[in-house]
Amino acid sequence: MEFACKKIDVQDIIACSLGLKKSEYKVFEALLQSDHVSLKELSKKLNLDRTTLQKILKRFVDNDLVQRFQENLDNGGYVFLYKIKGKEILKKRINAALEKWYETAKLSIEKW
């Protein structure tokens, strides 16, 4: 998509609307590609250490972007799995952020 003299990628719009840093967006994208995934699987897939991923995933859960749920293992114990919130829910959040930006930009132009 192009806006005046600058090309804007949809990834930038999504990341900006959801308040994601570049490194967080990579995790977000990996979650979008999976139905649900464990910390260990994500760590291996993205080549990120578990501590870094835990911080990012906690932030995602706190910001209601991702669901965390527990799966009990057959041999005892459990593993936490992470799943992205529904895409339609996220689209609504992104569109709301875009509308807010648009209104702010419009007011700024009117005040100019």
Where are these regions (language model features)?
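Basic amphipathic alpha-helical segments that dock to polyanions
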Residues: 31, 42, 53, 57-63
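Short acidic, hydrophobic short linear motifs in intrinsically disordered regions
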Residues: 36-44
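Amphipathic alpha-helical dimerization/coiled-coil segments
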Residues: 87-112
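A short, conserved structural fragment
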Residues: 61-71
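Short, cationic-aromatic polyanion-contact patches
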Residues: 13-23, 38, 69-93
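Short, Lys/Arg-enriched N-terminal segment that forms or immediately precedes the first helix
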Residues: 2-18
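Pre-recognition alpha-helix immediately N-terminal to the DNA-recognition helix
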Residues: 25-29
